[in-house]
Amino acid sequence: MRWISATLMGVVMLAGCGENVKFRNPLAKNQPKQQAAPAQTAAKPKADPKPVQTKEAQARNTMIRTTSLRGGGASRFGNGKTVGANSSVEENVERLRTEIAGSIDFAPTMIVWIVDSTLSASELRSSWANGAKKLYTDFQTNGLPGGKPADNLSTAIVSFGEKTDFVIEQPTTNFGEVIGKLAAIQTDNSGKESTFATIGQVFDKYGPIKQQQGRELMVVVVTDEAGDDWKQVDSIVEKANSTGVRVYAIGVPAPMGRMMAEVAPQESRSDGMPAMLQGPETRYSQRVDMKFNSGGFGGDDVDSGYGPFGLTYLAYQTRGSFLVSRLRSAPWPGSAMRFDDEVMRKYPPQYLTEAQYQAKLSENKALAALHQAASQGQVEAMTYPASQFVVEDEARLKNALDGAQRIAARLEPMINAVYDPLAEGEKDRDKITDKRWQASYDLALGRAAAVKARVDGYNQMLAILKGGRKFEDPSHDTWNLEPADTLEEAGSRLEKTRLQAKEYLERIIKEHPDTPWAYFAEKELETPIGWKWVEY
């Protein structure tokens, strides 16, 4: 629905500005050109001596495996260097063969497949069934890896949507029975996904069987979403550790900093929840939701390269993996922009418990401010502001200026709700040591300052014209407000805000090259952060 909101905003902006104003998009000449990939990727840093790792650092380093298990593809950067997030579901099912082999080599193993039965997961589910059929047919024909007897691997299948359904409830070692049930999952049209409740039920049901039979327990979650109840993840991790289970997930990458991508949902819901909940990749979003002046609809989505936080955190806390998959026809991730794995491995999400995450926020005002700013609603861009004012009649000119100023007045509180906490927390910026948090805070403040400078500057420049401004050429009768790299005429306060935006955005480009944060900083800088009057 965001594209509808953006369209309505453009219509509202055109209202109430009087006959003295002519409309055009003053930002149109700054529309971004298609960017080519840089000729070279950043030089690889020299390996540092291995430090003594904390438990948190060990967990995060383990998480980075999420990109190492992915296949080839083309990145925006690196001249087509192969990157991940391009493996098929079937390929990721096949990758689990190695995990199964390692497990049954250690001890007899029970594997429980937890499969998303919702409508949006139809392609994922079909691809999983194809991959699993190939896997189990091979087990049936050629035996288990390492020559292990068939009873060393038992299988159960569970599906979930709004409710949980046990497709193969009693674990079976009959591979033919498993093959026969792969396509037996019924589609759930509710759009609801009780993912973590189902995982908890599986632990409760199969944990005791694991103990009774002396088996290892592997759980594989196959889903295209994050789960409506993903916030249960900390309690589920505790239950997983007490059960002694290794969790894997096969799914799509999370949209960076977003609960859902700006694509048409494949299903609908009536309970107020997003139709498709697929992110973010961090526990909470660390990306402010501000539209770009220079961007089109749906142009802000980025493939994070990581799975949604809850499932990824669960998988790696149990020594499993989240296997990122790309689907052939699903709208997400589709052709969304993605970045080189070698770069993104340096920016893993913070895999912390809820308590640990909140402690980090309480210790640093900049992080707390980022958290607050990223939780605000979307701030629309001032895409088509009035820019040309004909001076024919003072009363009509005043009406036109009043109407134009109402646009800025409407946006101002939304912008301040993002900018003000970030500016207040700036004093703690240099205390941030995590690279992802550094880049996220800098981008948030840089973008918020840029938007504030443009909107407040626009309002102030209109106020200056309203107060009276003489033409240098007496034959001229029109003032045109054009984008410029200055706000000196609007006042020192706004010029300071403009310079603050420029400083933060340029720092991101310098310190975090070839990353999504640098890309968004470049995109923000494509439009000048300021205004000037030109007479005609």
Give, region by region, the residue ranges found by the protein language model.
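Bacterial signal peptide processing site
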Residues: 18-20
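VWA/integrin I-like adhesion module and closely mimicked acidic/polar interface patches used
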Residues: 225-310
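Short coil/linker segments at helix-helix boundaries
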Residues: 393-400, 455-511, 516, 533-536
